[in-house]
Structures are given as C-alpha cells and as structure tokens.
Amino acid sequence: MQLESKNLPLLISEVKEGLIKTIQATHPQAKDIRDNMFRSLAKEFETFTDIYTTNYDIFLYKIILANNTLNQLKVENMGDFGDGFFEEISSGRLGFQDFDIKPRNLIYLHSSLFIFNQNGNTYKIHKIDGKVEYINLIQIELDNNNFPVYVAEGRADKKYMEINDNYYLRMALNRLKKRNGDLITFGFSFGKSDKHIVDAINSSDTSIIVASIYPDKTESQLSAEISRITNLFPNKGVQFFDSRTMFTFDFPKYAY
C-alpha cells in the first residue's frame, strides 16, 4: 500500500495522538502508586535474577528502581538490577551496552515505551528531573517524530523479523536462549504469535518451566490449557501454579 506524501504528516500525527492516549489510559502516573508499593514488590522479586517481560509499560522498571534504592539506602542487600542501558549518549538518553554490568537484569523482549531508535542507535530515555512523568518525556520524543521501538502484535514470523532488525532486541532474545536453571512465567499465555519465545526457551538450558494459570476456566478448559503449554516443551519439565498466589498487588506486603 502506498500513501500520498501529503497524507503522511496527518498519519504521523494520528499515530502520535493515538499512542499518547493509549499510554494515558493504561499507564499509572507516579502519584497513583506509592513508593512503598514498588518497594514491597521489589522485596517480592528478591529471589529472581533476570526478569524477561513482553509488556511495553514501565511498571516493572519502577520496581527495579525501588530495588536499587533499597540497596543504596542499605535497607536491603538484594543485588542491583540493570537493563543494559548505561552509556550516556546525550542528556536524558542512555545507550545499550551489555546485560552483564549488573548482577540482575530486566530484559524487554518486545521493547518498551521508553526505548527509541534514532539513526540505527537504540536508546532509553530516563528521568533527570524526578518530578517529570515518563509520559511527558515520551511526548517530547514523539513531538520530534521519534517513535518507541516495540514489537507489535501479529504473526510469529513478523515478530521474529522485527526482533532481528534491532540489535537490542536480538541481544534480549539471545539472552533468553542462553539462560539455564528454572524459569517462572507469570501472566504469559504462550500464544502462537510468541513462537520465537517458545523456541528460545526450548533451545536454552532451562530445566523446568513453572507457568502461572489463572483459574477462571472450567476444569476441562484448565486441563486443555495445561496440556497445550506442556506440549510446547517436550524436553523440559513443566509445572503450574495459581497466578493469584504469586505477588501482592492490592497492598504492600512489606513495610518500608
């Protein structure tokens, strides 16, 4: 499909406006979630090393920041989190370096709303002024016609092509391929469009997959779901747990 050049600015404007509205509707502002909630969740994450996410929002990022703050204050000693973005390329922008700089990592398998690419360079925007909301920083990037890097929903082969076109996303998926030990998944459906993730886990040295199941189905539906996921990993051990028992999102479980 070809677009007339005169329609392109209008299309770009509509995409930007739609993206901002989506972020505003789905992403909580800092004032909506207290710091003690993020710190409590950071404590619940204590047993995890690398965390892989396919979510685009920055909720998990705020949890790892809370984790690092607790360590800096010497309230906890849980091991710092990083996400591979450490190189200061300009004010408020960090370029990707490596996942091995910090002992624990948050890895965005499908990228995130605050990760952008300009002239082939992938960078993460970060706050210089703590009072500024991330949505405002994202708005500035959009106003400069810079759009977030993200792997859109669609066919598995299309997703895989998008990942291979971006250095950071390739490194993120390769990190999953090279992992070992047990893998706990939470809120991930292992759908057909995420075959690249299933393939990465199957090619890794992961020994056991512990997958969450939300029990809002009939017994036969749950049985079918368990069988479907188990069959995706013929050479791995697969176990399941009730997703409601994993984390406490309604109130801080730990007081800080």
Language model segments and positions:
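N-terminal accessory alpha/beta regions
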Residues: 1-23
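Extended, H/D-rich, highly charged conserved domains that either
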Residues: 1-9, 41-164
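Short acidic, glycine/Ser/Thr-rich loop/turn "cap" segments at secondary-structure junctions
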Residues: 18-26, 41-48
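Alpha-helix capping at helix-to-loop junctions
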Residues: 21-28, 65, 69
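Short, flexible loop segments at the rims of nucleotide/cofactor-binding pockets, characterized by
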Residues: 24-32, 158-165, 186-189
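A short, well-structured juxtamembrane/interface segment
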Residues: 27-43, 165-176
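SIR2/sirtuin-family catalytic core signature
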Residues: 159, 170-256
